[in-house]
Amino acid sequence: YNDRAISYRVHKGFDHADVALSAGVQRMVRSDKGAAGVMFTMDTESGFDQVVFITASYGLGETVVQGAVNPDEYFVHKPIMEMGKFPIIRKVLGSKKIKMIFDTDKSSGRSVKVVDVPESERRKFALNDDEIVQLAKYARIIEKHYGRPMDIEWGKDGIDGKLYILQARPETVKSRQKKADVQQKFVLLGKGEVLVTGRAIGQKIGAGKVRIVAGPEQMDLVQEGDVLVTDMTDPNWEPVMKKASAIVTNRGGRTCHAAIIARELGIAAVVGCGDATEVLKDGQEVTVSCAEGDTGNIYNGLIPFEIKEVKQGELPEIPVKIMMNVGNPQLAFDFQSIPNNGVGLARLEFIINNNIGIHPKACLAYPDLPEDLRRAVEEASAGYENPREFFKEKIAEGVATIAAAFYPKKVIVRMSLSLIHISEP
């Protein structure tokens, strides 16, 4: 009978006395010595159901759920996996700065502690490719069993090295949204100074005055329409989150509490920004855009935007097959829902610009680069053997993501002979 439980039952219309409770007992998976995370049998932002989306970080999974860390992210394409081919189409390295482990103090509330993750481990993916695929296979089995999209928590035991499924429950946001006859698209009508970036949640845009909240004791400061800016959120924040026009957090990934609640409320959120509470100023007017791909941008000032509506039921039948022009892999899962006959042109140079962000010449010249440029290249290519390998992998991921989004329709990619040297040993 805490505040959160009472609020939930009232919101859902449950009688307090009629709700049954139970206690489950299961083996403790030693993910404090391994890794843990959450996976969905669909893309949480677009609702695209042909992928398994996995997040992973070191230590107990509570830090991922809380949004205390920015975890690694992996996308696995279901049809390719079931063909027995390599199915990982995208990997994103998270910062993973902290992890939760067991403490020697056995007293109540003190059995775990949070410690820093060594820099060398942060720059590595928490899971290898075989483990990613194995988790995706588990997720697919669970999804088929229940016959619906699922939200699954998992852990890797650091002692025996095995992967364990800890919890599985129905996905409750995207899967319940019926495919509407009218599609909304938020579009910025201008540009401005980008103050902070992070992981975009949803595809909407919100704007208002910044309200920096250090903790729950300051939640009363948030007014209707404010942009809530904080380090991270937990279930106690939900009443005040409903007032916000947008949410911005320093920490967290796409499966953290702030992201989940933002989807339920239908508002823009940018998580894992790192320094939002330091860069943004209380009372400052900003625009929070999640309408530009995986990266969410917080712009200085109130930038006008519009909401375009397309009534799919009114689209006329035409005698020619219309193919799409797609250059940003980050938007492919969204674009595939628009009526189409595949991709007629995916320019490799656009994929490089949107998916990689490093000029191929910088990869070729590494490490013989100016100090500041060399460090920037190393930072961008962390998690890979070298910048050249990073470049090759990200090109492959970009093409694979677009192909997976539109599968089994045809996707035509315009290659570039000028990149031939990147693939040479």
What is the predicted function of each stretch?
Residues 55-151, 202-203, 389-392:
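Conserved catalytic alpha/beta cores of large enzymes that bind or transform nucleotide phosphates
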Residues 1-46, 57, 111-145, 149:
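Extended, highly charged
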Residues 1-3, 31-104, 166-196, 243-250, ...:
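Extended active-site and interfacial segments that coordinate phosphate-rich ligands
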Residues 420-425:
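Conserved small/polar residues in nucleotide/adenosyl-binding loops
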Residues 159, 173-175, 195-227, 231-346, ...:
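Acidic, glycine-rich flexible loop/linker segments
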Residues 124-154, 319-336, 387-406:
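Phosphate-interacting basic helix/loop segments used at nucleotide- and nucleic-acid interfaces
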Residues 147-172:
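Conserved metal-phosphate-binding beta-hairpin within the catalytic cores
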Residues 354, 365-417:
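Active-site loops and adjacent core secondary-structure elements that bind or stabilize anionic groups
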